[in-house]
């Protein structure tokens, strides 16, 4: 963790180059702002059949840490929001979900 998953309207999916740039932005934000180890960062892009709402939904799952205060998470979300607009031209709904170690069961 963190895992950053983007569900993007299939009809408005950005070009591969734009997604690669956004992926690099996400890795940078996760390692610098959230202080995650590079090996623990995952970024995934999913094509979605859009129903209603923003054309992008960003779902961030992360491990709760004392360094990830509300102010840090707000800074992360603001920077992520700007990166999404800069790389895709689309508006995103961003949601972050923190998990404590006792509530997280994982492999690999």
Predicted regions and their residues:
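A domain-level signal for the structural core that forms small-molecule/cofactor-binding pockets
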Residues: 1-108
């Amino acid at each position: 963790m963190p895992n950053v998953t983007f569900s993007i309207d299939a009809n408005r999916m950005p070009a591969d180059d734009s997604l690669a740039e956004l992926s690099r932005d996400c890795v940078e934000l996760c390692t610098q702002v959230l202080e995650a180890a590079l090996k623990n960062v995952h970024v995934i892009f999913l094509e979605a059949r859009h129903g209603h709402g923003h054309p992008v939904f960003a779902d961030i799952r992360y491990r709760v840490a004392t360094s990830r205060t509300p102010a840090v998470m707000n800074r992360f979300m603001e920077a992520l929001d700007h990166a999404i607009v800069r790389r895709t031209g689309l508006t995103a709904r961003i949601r972050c979900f923190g998990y404590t170690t006792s509530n997280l069961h994982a492999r690999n």
